[in-house]
Amino acid sequence: MSVKVFIDGSSGTTGLRIADRLAARPEIELLSISAEGRKDVNERASVINSADLAFLCLPDAASREVMPLLRPDVKVLDTSTAFRTDPAWDYGFPELKGQKEKIQNSCRVAVPGCYASGFISIARPLVELGLAPVDYPFSCTGLSGYSGGGKKMIAEYESPDRPAHSKIDAPKSYGLTLGHKHLPEMQKISGLAHTPAFVPVVCDYYSGMQVLVPLDLKLAGTTAGQVAEGIAAYYKDGATVSVHALNEPLPENGLYSNALSGSDRMELYLTVNAAGDQMMLISLFDNLGKGSSGAAVQCMNLMLDLNETEGLE
């Protein structure tokens, strides 16, 4: 027996990726809507209400507009920022403590933001395990492929009219007033007393993400060994998250941000300096995989009582 699934917003980057993943799965029946119907919130709601599960791959306002029209028992996965800090919604990161069970029993799941996924994968266990205090002054830097900017940015970077040498050849930092839209979920889901200082950087490659979080071990009141042991134990049963050993030799003496492009896995790297008082914790993944459509499909599998990693790469 097939499961009826509808993707509201199937023409965007995330929606297209989800549709491609589900099209090859015989147990999934993808529902459709006319071009005219996509512009009618009541028509969209009608199709969603006929589904077993729906993905909302929409701007925040469009997601908020349709939600009051939906049956409470329809399973909904929202990929916007609209509901990620809403207490009525469950956060779609199954590897966090207790989160898998919540997602399995939920009708409302908010898919994490890409940068937020990387930061939370590090900060949440540090705070939860008492390896850093809730008021620790966290900071992080995130590097992303240009697909994270959606269709408009993809078109800019891949334009046939792009000059041989242009400013977008170089990495671009942005959000420099420290107000990125992922910050509320980064703080709340990690359990922090203060908003972290976060700077994102977009780079000239299609997909892949690296989030780097420095840790002052004296200020945190812990040791590198305790951090490595704690994080490894935290994710030991994680379906898509793995942890490398402390100071494991890095491939090519560093990490390329696009190393996991095309994958739905997340890999955490932990390094410590010679003095043993500073660490760098790095989350490596694909912004379109664990940072977006891969996480959404993983949550769908759990909500529909399917194999958690079915359809993942």
Please provide the spans of the model-predicted regions.
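Short, hydrophobic/amphipathic alpha-helical packing segments
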Residues: A116-A123, G179, S293, V297
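Residue-level signal for short, function-critical loop segments
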Residues: C114, L219, N287
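C-terminal substrate-binding/catalytic lobe of Rossmann-fold NAD(P)-dependent oxidoreductases
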Residues: S11-A45, P137, T141-G142, Y146-L281
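Active-site catalytic microenvironments for nucleophilic, acid-base chemistry
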Residues: P125-L129, D216, C299-L306
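N-terminal Rossmann-like NAD(P) cofactor-binding subdomain of oxidoreductases
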Residues: M1-Y174, V272-A274, E310-L312
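PAPS/PAP-binding and catalytic site of the sulfotransferase fold
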Residues: V109, V227-G230, A296
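C-terminal helical cap and adjacent loop that interface with cofactors, partners, or active-site loops
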Residues: S257-E313
